[in-house]
Design a protein with these regions (language model features):
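Positively charged, amphipathic and often flexible ligand-engagement surfaces
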Residues: 1-185
Length: 186
């Protein structure tokens, strides 16, 4: 800030979630280092976005939001109405095209960076598969949007309301690592 430069900070959500879950299970750790419910990841992302848009970071951080989630983008846009910060969105080449095309028509000047991963095949393929799985999951906004049986009010449920539906914080459908292989110590 004192030098007049802003540090670009890229906020991502869930990029290595499956790797963290698998590592925890293979190593038999007591719990998971990541949220096991999507709503909690969504809330955490929004909380971090709120901080990145706050006066505390103005002039020091250039917020970059990597997301293909329409509700997340709308939350960020709403929070930024107050601060009017210069921000950037980022999307993976081939994902979120229609969403961002529509937004850029509605908001000329919106900065959207399209990125394409590069690297050796052994690293690149797993990365792309993770992104496809993440964005094609049944819980994704686009999947619900295309499903004629999904009520409109279910498309725009705030993640806090979704999180509050559960009595237990952790997702009980994902067994804790020590319970994975009870016959042996991981």
């Amino acid at each position: 800030r004192e030098c007049g430069d802003e540090i670009p900070v890229r906020l991502v959500k869930g990029a290595y979630w499956d790797n963290e879950i698998k590592w925890s299970q293979e190593n038999g750790v007591t719990g998971y280092p990541v949220f096991t419910r999507k709503a909690h990841s969504d809330l955490s992302y929004i909380a971090c976005a709120r901080y990145l848009l706050s006066d505390d970071t103005d002039g020091a951080i250039y917020p970059q939001f990597a997301t293909h989630n329409a509700q997340t983008i709308m939350s960020i846009e709403h929070m930024n109405e107050t601060h009017k910060r210069r921000i950037e969105y980022q999307r993976l080449h081939g994902m979120g095209d229609n969403l961002y095309d529509t937004l850029m028509k509605q908001k000329p000047g919106m900065v959207v960076r399209i990125y394409a991963p590069v690297g050796p095949h052994r690293d690149l393929l797993p990365y792309l598969v993770r992104r496809l799985l993440e964005n094609g999951a049944n819980s994704s906004f686009v999947h619900k949007l295309l499903d004629a049986d999904t009520p409109v009010d279910e498309l725009v449920v705030h993640p806090l309301k979704t999180a509050m539906r559960h009595e237990v914080y952790a997702n009980d459908k994902i067994p804790l690592p020590p319970a994975m292989y009870e016959e042996r110590k991981n």
